[in-house]
UniProtKB/Swiss-Prot annotation:
Cofactor binding summary note: Manganese or magnesium. Binds 1 divalent metal ion per monomer in the absence of substrate. May bind a second metal ion after substrate binding.
InterPro entries tied to this protein: RNase_HII (IPR022898), RNase_HII/HIII (IPR001352), RNase_HII/HIII_dom (IPR024567), RNaseH-like_sf (IPR012337), RNaseH_sf (IPR036397)
Span of the signal peptide: none
Known role: Endonuclease that specifically degrades the RNA of RNA-DNA hybrids.
GO biological process: DNA replication, removal of RNA primer; mismatch repair
Name of the molecule in the record: Ribonuclease HII
Highest taxon in the source lineage: Bacteria
Record-annotated RNase H type-2 domain positions: 12-201
Co-factor(s): Mn(2+); Mg(2+)
GO-annotated molecular function: manganese ion binding; RNA binding; RNA-DNA hybrid ribonuclease activity
Length: 208
């Protein structure tokens, strides 16, 4: 359901929850939950996608310093492949809320559905541009995942991960065709699965 209130006025132990990384072909899906401190306002909170990288980095530190509580969580590639991306995202959101050092009275979830939580929750469509706490969560999740993708680029050179962050760009798809999937690629996603299926067929044929 959508709450009938001015989201910008929601304060007092309300956690904002968001995710980054549902669409990429590789890497974990990363989530964050944030309870802002109304006595320590943070200027310039907005959907992380609408901010420059430099601004996100500044806000990342400020959010962690000023928030009443925050937690960054994740679901790994293996969980995404086993559960599917939707259920893995819900699991990661659940972990983020449960990892808060302060129990919120309400969790506002970006999007149109909520994970199973032990506290009341409500979805907020486009919440990262409507609810400051969700915007803060989106910033923590995006900066964390982007940093991880830079490290993955060093571990798996040639795929351009630092640039596309795992999303299915032409550069990424061409590298997949040329180099094959890495251990961090999501086997359940169609472009990766399509590259692995001929291998499975060949293995079956070889045993006949």
């Amino acid at each position: 359901m959508q709450l009938g209130l001015d989201f910008s006025l929601v304060e007092e132990l309300v956690a904002g929850v968001d995710e980054v990384g549902r669409g990429p072909l590789c890497g974990a899906v990363v989530t964050a939950a944030v309870i802002l401190d109304p006595l320590r306002p943070i200027i310039g909170l907005n959907d992380s996608k609408k901010l420059t990288e430099a601004r996100r980095e500044v806000l990342f530190d400020e959010i962690r310093e000023k928030a009443l509580a925050w937690c960054i969580a994740r679901a790994e590639v293996e969980e995404i492949d086993r559960l599917n991306i939707l259920h893995a995202t819900m699991l990661a959101m659940q972990r983020a809320v449960e990892g808060l050092s302060v129990t919120p009275k309400l969790a506002l979830i970006d999007g149109n559905r909520c994970p199973r939580l032990t506290v009341p929750s409500a979805p907020v469509v486009k919440g990262d541009s409507r609810v400051p706490a969700i915007a803060a969560a989106s910033i923590l999740a995006k900066v964390s995942r982007d940093r991880e993708m830079l490290e993955m680029d060093r571990l798996y050179p040639g795929y351009g991960i630092a640039g596309h962050k795992g999303y299915p760009t032409p550069v990424h798809l061409e590298a997949l065709q040329r180099l094959g999937p890495t251990p961090i690629h999501r086997r359940s996603f169609a472009p990766v699965r399509a590259l692995l299926e001929p291998v499975a067929v060949d293995c079956i044929a070889a045993t006949v």
